[in-house]
Amino acid sequence: MNCLMLIFVVFLLAFGVECKKDDYPVDTAKRNCMLDCNVWDDEGYCDKFCKGRKADSGYCYKLKAACYCYGLPDDSPTKTSGRCNPNVR
């Protein structure tokens, strides 16, 4: 039984595990600015943007007027605590 568990752990480490996250996408990690959206859009813009970032889906979160994505890859930049820095290139 222990041998089987060891093989399973080695298999996971060897082939990796793809994790996904739900969060606000940002244009670049350095700028940390959420993507604005039109709250009257029928969620088409954000869904297309999120799918372009390889997410499962997305919508315009109306209270923040920002796109929110479901199922983003782990390496996709998302909003962190801190302010937006629009002047950073």
Swiss-Prot record:
Keyword Signal included in the entry's annotation: yes
SUPFAM superfamilies (alphabetical): Scorpion toxin-like (SSF57095)
PROSITE patterns reported in the protein's UniProt record: LCN_CSAB
Keyword DNA-binding: no
Localization of this protein: Secreted
Disulfide bond residue pairs: C33-C84, C37-C60, C46-C67, C50-C69
Main location: secreted
Tissue specificity statement from the Swiss-Prot or TrEMBL entry: Expressed by the venom gland.
Signal sequence extent: 1-19
Keywords: Disulfide bond, Ion channel impairing toxin, Neurotoxin, Secreted, Signal, Toxin, Voltage-gated sodium channel impairing toxin
Annotated Gene Ontology cellular component terms: extracellular region
GO molecular function, one term: toxin activity
Chain ranges of the LCN-type CS-alpha/beta domain: 21-85
A Pfam match: Toxin_3
Gene Ontology BP terms: defense response
InterPro entries in alphabetical order: LCN-type_CS_alpha_beta_dom (IPR044062), Scorpion_toxin-like (IPR003614), Scorpion_toxin-like_sf (IPR036574), Scorpion_toxinL (IPR018218), Scorpion_toxinL/defensin (IPR002061)
Classification via Gene3D superfamilies: Knottin, scorpion toxin-like
SMART domains on file: Knot1
Notes concerning its domains: Has the structural arrangement of an alpha-helix connected to antiparallel beta-sheets by disulfide bonds (CS-alpha/beta).
Role, per record: Inhibits voltage-gated sodium channels (Nav).
Stated family: Belongs to the long (4 C-C) scorpion toxin superfamily. Sodium channel inhibitor family.
Protein name, entry field: Toxin To14
Biological source species: Tityus obscurus
